[in-house]
Regions:
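C-terminal output helix
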Residues: 88, 106-116
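The feature encodes the CheY-like receiver
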Residues: 15, 55-58
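Short amphipathic alpha-helix used as the core "switch/output" element in two-component signaling
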Residues: 63-75
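Alpha4 helix (beta4-alpha4-beta5 surface) of REC/receiver domains from two-component response regulators
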Residues: 64, 85-100
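Acidic catalytic/metal-coordinating carboxylates
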Residues: 33-34, 61-64
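Two-component/phosphorelay signaling modules centered on CheY-like receiver
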Residues: 12-30, 96
Length: 126
């Protein structure tokens, strides 16, 4: 069964581009333009195997969204993305439990490496 990845980015081109790319690799996707729209969709949160979240969103920012997700879900795997990230943002993302912090424009090979790594670690026997 294909894994479902949720993309949250207020830039339509990034959001749809990532969703289309992920679908072309066989993943199911849900895409949201705001933190609030995702938090209002229990089904999307419950079925997500991974979250890709932009830091700068209208309304609640991506870090705050990830904090909300960690309160609702047990260790949600998240990749945080940002068009203007710095070292303090990178450290904060990892402190929150993100599996990666990627600058925009996203290097697709690196993105898929993190995704494959996350999904293979979940599939490995404990």
């Amino acid at each position: 069964m294909p894994q479902r990845i949720v993309v949250v980015d207020d830039e339509r081109s990034v959001r749809t581009g990532l969703a289309n790319l992920l679908q072309s690799e066989g993943y199911l996707t849900d895409a949201f333009e705001s933190a609030e729209s995702l938090l209002g969709n229990e089904a999307a949160m419950a079925t997500a195997a991974l979250f890709i979240i932009d830091v700068q969103l209208k309304g609640m920012d991506g870090f705050e969204l990830f904090i909300h997700l960690t309160r609702r879900l047990e260790k949600p795997p998240g990749i945080i993305i940002s068009g203007n990230g710095d070292d303090s943002m990178l450290r904060y993302a990892f402190d929150l439990g993100a599996i990666a912090f990627l600058p925009k424009p996203i290097e697709i090979d690196i993105l898929f490496e993190h995704i494959r790594q996350e999904f293979s670690s979940k599939a490995a026997p404990q």
